[in-house]
Amino acid sequence: MPKMKTNRGASKRFKVKKNLIKRGSAFKSHILTKKSPKRKANLNAPKHVHHTNAHSVMSLLCRA
């Protein structure tokens, strides 16, 4: 049986730390002038993948 291949796009977007999968936040790359500093700071805060999607992400990362 051949080796499982890691999804390269997923490997760049997600990092596995202990039991949680870290992810980036959307809506923070451009058109930032109309967004308040508080909103931009909240977008910079670390986020985690929801537990209902965790199995799908782990299978893309070949860790299921």
Swiss-Prot record:
Family designation: Belongs to the bacterial ribosomal protein bL35 family.
Any GO MF annotation of the entry: structural constituent of ribosome
Cellular component aspect of the GO annotation: cytosolic large ribosomal subunit
GO biological process: translation
Biased composition (Basic residues): 38-53
Annotated NCBIfam families: rpmI_bact
Record flagged with keyword Ribosomal protein: yes
UniProt-annotated stretches for the region Disordered: 38-64
Protein name in UniProt: Large ribosomal subunit protein bL35
HAMAP family: Ribosomal_bL35
PANTHER family for the chain: 54S RIBOSOMAL PROTEIN BL35M, LARGE RIBOSOMAL SUBUNIT PROTEIN BL35M
PROSITE patterns cross-referenced by the UniProt entry: RIBOSOMAL_L35 (PS00936)
Keyword set, alphabetical order: Ribonucleoprotein, Ribosomal protein
UniProt-listed SUPFAM superfamilies: L35p-like
Family matches, as InterPro entries: Ribosomal_bL35, Ribosomal_bL35-like, Ribosomal_bL35_CS, Ribosomal_bL35_sf
Gene name per UniProt: rpmI
